[in-house]
Amino acid sequence: MTIAFQLAVFALIAISFILLISVPVVFASPEGWSNNKNVVFSGTSLWIGLVFLVGILNSLIS
């Protein structure tokens, strides 16, 4: 269970870093938002899911 928690935290950190870089780039580029809207929404949905997963796994470990 600890390994799953550590992998979930690592994935959350990795996705956070990717979104931190990619979202401003998408907003700054011309026509970037209309072309990459689905990618940003998918990344945000994945991030929200990982936040809940880390919370659930944390409550099971503690």
From Swiss-Prot:
Bilayer topology annotation: Multi-pass membrane protein
Native source species: Glycine max (Soybean)
The keyword Membrane is assigned to this record: yes
Classification via HAMAP family: PSII_PsbZ
Sequence similarity: Belongs to the PsbZ family.
Localization of this protein: Plastid, Chloroplast thylakoid membrane
Assembly with partners or alone: PSII is composed of 1 copy each of membrane proteins PsbA, PsbB, PsbC, PsbD, PsbE, PsbF, PsbH, PsbI, PsbJ, PsbK, PsbL, PsbM, PsbT, PsbY, PsbZ, Psb30/Ycf12, at least 3 peripheral proteins of the oxygen-evolving complex and a large number of cofactors. It forms dimeric complexes.
Residue intervals passing through the bilayer: 8-28, 41-61
Gene Ontology biological-process annotations: photosynthesis; photosystem II stabilization
Keywords from the named record: Chloroplast, Membrane, Photosynthesis, Photosystem II, Plastid, Reaction center, Thylakoid, Transmembrane, Transmembrane helix
Official protein name in the record: Photosystem II reaction center protein Z
Main localization category: plastid
Role: May control the interaction of photosystem II (PSII) cores with the light-harvesting antenna, regulates electron flow through the 2 photosystem reaction centers. PSII is a light-driven water plastoquinone oxidoreductase, using light energy to abstract electrons from H(2)O, generating a proton gradient subsequently used for ATP formation.
GO cellular component, one term: photosystem II reaction center
Disulfide bonds: none
Entry superkingdom: Eukaryota
